[in-house]
Curated annotation (Swiss-Prot):
Alphabetized NCBIfam families for the sequence: tsf
Signal peptide bounds: none
Xref: PANTHER family: ELONGATION FACTOR TS, ELONGATION FACTOR TS, MITOCHONDRIAL
Family that this chain belongs to: Belongs to the EF-Ts family.
Protein location: Cytoplasm
Keyword Protein biosynthesis in annotation: yes
CDD domains on file: UBA_EF-Ts
Domain of life: Bacteria
Statement: the UniProt record of this protein carries the keyword Phosphoprotein: no
Protein name, entry field: Elongation factor Ts
GO annotation, cellular component aspect: cytoplasm
Location of the region described as Involved in Mg(2+) ion dislocation from EF-Tu in the Swiss-Prot/TrEMBL record: 80-83
Any GO MF annotation of the entry: translation elongation factor activity
Length: 282
């Protein structure tokens, strides 16, 4: 049996970022062959990552990276808020975002493939499912970004002074508009909401003809509420975002808002009794 020296363990740790005992075990099993140890650790890591893949990863971080005229927003997920603050996890997320920006990668599948080995290594080290979930590139004459903690990120593309666009980005973070202008709301979305509002009015005892007329005002309110320029501006609620943009000589052509875990169905939290039962089952 080959001797596993401290120097070999140190080198393997530096190359894999794995723990000391894991490195020593891998070297013993590989009879001191460091390349074989690395290969075996990668295979073991892939197997562990595959087992973790079914775990719900709804925590994580939003990263924003910018350079002249281009910005990237990235969502990387993990299972717990504790890991979301881990330096290794955040370092990985930042590296992915930097590459996405440098290579203008807007294809999530290609980005995932590029970082799969690094992801597997991180899953092995941290012990949680890690997912590169979403990436969005935004281009524009003028860009403004806003990050609310680690969980929400917004990038605005448009024209105007930096302060105005920054305030609009903050508004988007808080108010969650779905479209830029009321006219951008798709016809099928409008028709679906209109049908709901007509039914509500008729259930209130209104004849269909009157209900149809009542709904006109409600639909204007609806398209305003779901669009950026139609919303009341959070910093001056008596004015709409459109009013503010007009006053400042600014405009918004596009925006992207990402929030960690949105759309992911989280598992229901276990009660204390359920936790005890689970422990007893082993």
């Amino acid at each position: 049996m080959a001797t596993v020296t401290a120097a070999l363990v140190k080198e393997l740790r530096e190359r894999t970022a794995a723990g000391m005992m894991e490195c020593k075990k891998a070297l013993v099993e590989a009879e001191g062959d460091i390349e074989l140890a690395i290969e075996n650790m990668r295979k073991s890591g892939a197997a562990k990552a595959a087992k973790k893949a079914g775990n719900i990863a709804a925590e994580g971080t939003i990263i924003i990276k910018e350079e002249a005229g281009v910005a990237v927003l990235l969502e990387v997920n993990c299972q717990t808020d504790f890991v979301a603050k881990d330096s290794g996890f955040l370092g990985f997320a930042n590296e992915v975002a930097e590459v996405a920006l440098a290579e203008r990668l807007n294809d999530i599948v290609a980005l995932q493939a590029k970082f799969e080995d690094a992801r597997i290594a991180l899953v092995t080290k941290i012990g949680e499912n890690i997912s590169i979930r979403r990436v969005q590139l935004v281009e524009g004459v003028a860009l403004a970004s806003y990050r609310h903690g680690e969980k929400i990120g917004v990038v605005i593309a448009g024209e105007g002074d930096a302060e105005t666009l920054k305030h609009i980005a903050m508004h988007v973070a808080a108010s969650k508009p779905e479209y830029v202008n009321p006219s951008d709301v798709p016809a099928d979305v409008v028709e679906k909401e209109k049908a709901v509002q007509v039914e509500i009015a008729m259930n209130e005892g209104k004849p269909q003809e009157i209900a149809e007329k009542m709904v006109i005002g409600r639909m204007k309110k609806f398209t305003g509420e779901v669009s950026l320029t139609g919303q009341a501006f959070i910093m001056e609620p008596k004015k709409t975002v459109a009013d503010i943009l007009k006053e400042k000589g600014a405009s918004v052509s596009n925006f992207v808002r990402l929030e960690v875990g949105e759309g992911i169905e989280k598992a229901a939290e276990m009660s204390f009794a359920d936790e005890v039962a689970a422990v007893q089952k082993g």
